[in-house]
Structure formats: structure tokens, C-alpha cells
């Protein structure tokens, strides 16, 4: 696959990208380098892994990170129930050393996302989502996989990748990631889309919706994101949900009433609702925009 073919595949997936993003994706893919994508929550980092899986016609294997994540959830664990059953059935009928060896064979190994991705016969896209939520010990454990494309299991030994996955790591920057991890990855920082890009996303994902309504919503979302008082900045997915909600109600214009009725699709806590209300009241009291369409 060359870079133009990759761009064509992303176009087919209705994914809006720029040349920098397409180039980084292509080169990381060609070099077999993991790709670390950072940015605020909701800018579309996870979507990139999904689009790449579709573009490459590969399965997407996802590891959702969280505090306390360890090898048994990320890499493998043993099927203890099956092992106990085997011990009960074979007790006395098999040599104890042979039985012990058999208990730690493939038959009793439960694959978790990391092991599944490197033991797959066909290459996959491995998404390690929100790596910043996992602790530093887990991050250190990942280094062997990312640099050597292999993992070590004490009872089995080293398992090398049958196929090399395209690895995408995402981070919301909740904590700093180690330099060792960063060195092993290509890097991409995703910002919230500007007005023009957000409009392009809305057109691509919701082509049946009136362009004027999309423009009004995109502008309102830009204003919400730039408002320092808003605690949870609207994500791209929430922008899409908001337009879909307005469209489902047959609303063709983002009036103050329409905004109030549907704001729950774009704002997700009471404090932000109060900020919106204060902003609208302030605009009305100073006589500007009150009958207009660009509240936010």
C-alpha cells in the first residue's frame, strides 16, 4: 500500500485528515513502529485505530487501560478451573512432572489482548487505549512488546510475534509517559478541529443534514470549547450527536430555544449548563444575538 492508497481508504471511511496525519500513519506502518497519539479526550484518537483497521482490512484488538491493569488482564492468564479439573482426572494415572508440564501448555492458556495480537496468524491493529491511565509498572512491562515484538511468560518462555501488529497507543496526558516509551514510538498530537475541519466532519458523517444547521452547530461548539468556564469540552462525537438530535427533531436552525432543548447532547454536567445559561442571558441583556443563531 502506498500513501495515496492509504488516503483513498481513509476517504472511503469518511475520515477527515490532513497530510501530516496521513504521512505519519503511512511511515509508522511502513517502518513497523508503534504510534503514540496524544490529545484531549474526544478529539478522535481512538477513531484513528478503527480507521486504520478498516483501511488495512485487519481485525482491531483493543486493550482499554485503567489504574491497576496488570499482565493477567493485558497479556494472559491460566485457566485455573480447567487445570484443577485436569489434576483431579489425571491424579495417580500420570507422572507428576509430566502432569505439571502439561498444565502450563497452550491448552490452558487464556489469551488477553496483547498476546492475542502477536499470536494472530494475520496481522491486526492493536489499540492500547488511554495508556496514561495505567501505572508506570505496566508501561515498563509494555516496552518488551513494543521494542522486540515479543513477550515473556515464565512458565512458557519467550513468545515471538507470528505477525507484526500495527500498534496505536493513545493518551489524554493524565500523567507524563516515560521517555523510554516515547522513544519506541512515532508521535502524533491531535487538537480539536477548527471550524472548517469540524464542518467537513459533519458533512462527511451526516451528509443529509442541512449545511446551514451544521455551520451553526459547528460555530456553537467552537465557542463552547473556547469558553474557559466550560469544564468538559465537547468532543467530536458529541458534536455529531447534537446535530443528529436536532435533525431527529426536525430542527433546521439553532435558535436559543433549540439550543436549550438539546444541549444535553453536547454538555454533560450541570455546571456547564449553568455557564451556557449565563452566557445566553448575558448576550440577551446586552441586546446582541438574542434572536440569532450563534449562542454558545
How would you label these PLM feature ranges?
Residues 1-296:
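C-terminal regulatory/interaction module of P-loop NTP-utilizing enzymes
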